[in-house]
Amino acid sequence: MWKLKIANGNKEEPYLFSTNNFLGRQTWEFDPDAGTVEELAAVEEARRKFYDDRFRVKASSDLIWRMQFLKEKKFEQVIPPAKVEDANNITSEIATNALRKGVNFLSALQASDGHWPAENAGPLFFLPPLVFCLYVTGHLHEIFTQDHRREVLRYIYCHQNEDGGWGLHIEGNSTMFCTTLNYICMRILGEGPNGGPGNACKRARDWILDHGGATYIPSWGKTWLSILGVFDWSGSNPMPPEFWILPSFLPIHPAKMWCYCRLVYMPMSYLYGKRFVGPISPLILQLREEIYLQPYAKINWNRARHLCAKEDAYCPHPQIQDVIWNCLYIFTEPFLACWPFNKLLREKALGVAMKHIHYEDENSRYITIGCVEKALCMLACWVEDPNGIHFKKHLLRISDYLWIAEDGMKMQSFGSQLWDSGFALQALVASNLVNEIPDVLRRGYDFLKNSQVRENPSGDFTNMYRHISKGSWTFSDRDHGWQASDCTAESFKCCLLLSMIPPDIVGPKMDPEQLYEAVTILLSLQSKNGGVTAWEPARGQEWLELLNPTEVFADIVVEHEYNECTSSAIQALILFKQLYPNHRTEEINTSIKKAVQYIESIQMLDGSWYGSWGVCFTYSTWFGLGGLAAAGKTYNNCLAMRKGVHFLLTTQKDNGGWGESYLSCPKKRYIPSEGERSNLVQTSWAMMGLLHAGQAERDPSPLHRAAKLLINSQLENGDFPQQEITGAFMKNCLLHYAAYRNIFPVWALAEYRRRVPLPYEKPSTERRS
């Protein structure tokens, strides 16, 4: 039976190290002797139910670890269920009971170190490259036991679409990128050409061939297939490592790139520069014959460089980009491959690229910035030295990425421990039930205090293209090391809120100097236009997006400002200013003023804001209204507030909820979910947005209707049902935040109960009529 381990690290292992004793680390271990007959049966039943219902609900309910935690804590919900018939007759007692049930359940999900574990996955291109890397390096069976491989295959089967392919993410239509990767992954893990339940492999291969064959895979797929030896490097556009030795004044210097783009193409360029190809096994030779329409030896690789399936081509290359690739391919690459330039330039460039890879690995404790980079950097280290310590350190951090649920084993983005915990604690504080959960709040506060990054990247970090990180919070845990503005702002705000609760309940306050450092981080990430970026200051120019090589994502070349990050920063800085009015007062006031102007300036014509990190306009409108309200804007004195309220009120469904399709993200316009289907997480965001804008004082009936939906949807144990996933990134991809379904309904009910006047007595029969 699989068990989730918390803050687990072997102190005797010389290649595994941590900055704070592995706080927040979550890893899975298989114990063949664990579990009673009843527990094992419950797990199998959860797996069966998911598989049977997989085309209706695509995301897991994250049940395996929840079963474990609830049993370990002997959780039992004692509050009886209640249903609301008339939304206008919700009493304080009904709202409080529903809230208390949700608070009790959410509290029971807290880990011993104070964080809230949860799945953070969903893209279907995360896991196969890790399998490919382990296969190429010969470590697949060492790292992935038979039990691992069984669960990986389960995940692949569970998320195969009815047409035989796999989408970019678990809710998406089939793409060449993920269908090819997952087909090869199944074959590497032992399935035959026609293996898998329901003819999974044959149906996948048919999809690939019916859509033109694997020459139509996008560029990231071309890279991984070239590494495996089932594609030729000459079929990829150039990724010259000489990029890393360009003069810093050039606009295309890597220091000006978005950190994720920079750190993906860093190891890619190393592997491309080496033209590395793994061992050509009999399986690789078979795959060459299985995924193409023409014989492998007759493929026109030069033509293949520009091929991309229409199902994948979200961001097609502009003509100028293809001209650049052709020039590099025809003239530059042959030049750099010849003596003496291969010695003077290429070897030097490869050395510089590897220097950066090692630097990033060390400063993230070999977690790296994310899962895409993890497999690439690990492989690059092995190519440099198969027996080196860098590769050994990488192997020990693979488990940080793996997650088990009823739909199998998947690879996480890199964990959302701090992000989820900051929101969970804010929801619990908003409940006004703090006296009932002091231990939960104390553990959570300790987790946040001990997870703040306490140092900048090592050495001369500016020459390694890095920004300050001291005083920040990351998305996952402190060892990850990468500052993020919204993660910093939400954890910062949470620490400030907890500091306002008596220390005998939540523990001692943070050192003010640590709070000042968080202010420094937030101010450093604000651009001239008032917007706040996500990871680093915006250094590159917008026109560089014309060079986006990915085909499947948008706005990934340079750093951008975001409404959500800007709003989070406003709310945190305003609360800080209230508690510490004498620290950098003028700078903070100026920052807030500019940030408010930015939020107002990017509002859509319909009153919404585009969401970059959630689905989509509903998510970002909650942030937009929250930021403006924190800055003193009201429905009466601010047009943007009125427009935002109008957007939310006009998109509310007849059942009282809100439901927005994920297609809003790639299409960049509001698209409602089909019919009357509402999403409880999105309903919670909309409720809180309206509450920020004073809807309770004007007309609380939309809030009552939304609260009725939340209360009536709550399960008997205090949980809420899993619905469509609501996280997003890079315009075209979704991310499953499994904790959202508990955090946001609880938070919305807390704010509803706190801000909306509710009767204390149950309405009499006469009043109902």
Swiss-Prot record:
Family affiliation: Belongs to the terpene cyclase/mutase family.
Keyword Cytoplasm found: no
Function: Converts oxidosqualene to camelliol C. Minor production of achilleol and beta-amyrin.
Swiss-Prot/TrEMBL GO biological process terms: triterpenoid biosynthetic process
GO molecular function: beta-amyrin synthase activity; camelliol C synthase activity
Reaction catalysed by this enzyme: (S)-2,3-epoxysqualene = camelliol C
NCBIfam families in the record: squalene_cyclas (TIGR01787)
Annotated catalytic residues: 486
Regions crossing the membrane: none
PFTB repeat spans: 149-190, 641-682
Protein's name in the database: Camelliol C synthase
Keyword vocabulary terms for this entry: Isomerase, Repeat
